[in-house]
């Protein structure tokens, strides 16, 4: 029997399946809950049937700091790389959440900012969330994608009503991060832009 091996730059040729923490925990998610959920996926046999992804949703985000001004986790996710390494060690993959907006749905820091160094904080945003629900003039997709790759993440949920320019920036940032990371668009990617979503993401949610 002839075996044909094809090599290309396309990932996620079949729909990824797994677990996302938002419906269960919303903003109460933390490192211990993620690890417990990963363990449960293995213990219940789901991993052996193709369930591969353990995805952290909104509320992991802390502040931007360090030489790359990349977004860092808050106190709920100490040693985030160690957590990802553990998820990988039990045969699963790890996913993370972000948004092109200054602030996420839950009021945490996004991938853009109104200040050059991305100085917004959760406490500041929470006072008037509606003031931060826009795409800021300063963009940090490259910084954040590089950091996600260094932590070892395999999947990114990119949230809120998508526009092509923001999607293009994150798509290319992930492709140039040095790691294969699936880009999932959520939520309400306008259907009339479907050709762009096909070109610039691995999966998308229309509305």
Tell me what each language-model feature is.
Residues 24, 61, 101, 189-190:
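Short, solvent-exposed loop/turn segments at secondary-structure junctions
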Residues 70-72, 111-113, 170-173, 197-204:
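Short secondary-structure boundary/capping segments
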Residues 5-31:
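An acidic-aromatic substrate-binding cleft motif
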Residues 37, 41-166:
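Aromatic-lined carbohydrate-binding/catalytic grooves of carbohydrate-active enzymes
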Residues 130-132, 140, 182-207:
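Glycan-recognition surfaces
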Residues 9-14, 46-49, 87-89, 149-150, ...:
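Extracellular/periplasmic catalytic domains that process cell-envelope and extracellular macromolecules
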Residues 152-156, 160-189:
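Extracytoplasmic, non-cytosolic globular domains
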């Amino acid at each position: 029997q002839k075996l044909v091996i094809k090599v290309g730059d396309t990932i996620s040729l079949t729909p990824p399946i797994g677990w996302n923490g938002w419906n269960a925990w919303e903003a109460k998610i933390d490192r211990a809950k993620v690890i417990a959920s990963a363990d449960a996926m293995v213990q219940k046999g789901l991993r052996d049937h193709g369930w591969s992804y353990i995805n952290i949703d909104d509320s992991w985000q802390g502040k931007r700091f360090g030489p790359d001004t990349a977004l860092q986790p808050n106190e709920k996710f100490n040693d985030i790389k160690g957590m990802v390494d553990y998820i990988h060690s039990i045969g699963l993959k790890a996913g993370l959440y972000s948004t092109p907006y200054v602030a996420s749905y839950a009021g945490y820091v996004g991938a853009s900012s109104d200040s050059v160094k991305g100085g917004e904080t959760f406490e500041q945003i929470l006072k008037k969330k509606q003031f931060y629900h826009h795409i800021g003039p300063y963009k940090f997709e490259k910084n954040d994608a590089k950091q996600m790759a260094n932590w070892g993440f395999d999947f990114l949920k990119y949230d809120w009503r998508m526009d092509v320019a923001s999607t293009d920036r994150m798509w290319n940032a992930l492709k140039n991060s040095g790691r294969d990371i699936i880009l999932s668009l959520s939520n309400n990617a306008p259907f009339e832009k479907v050709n762009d979503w096909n070109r610039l993401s691995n999966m998308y949610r229309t509305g």
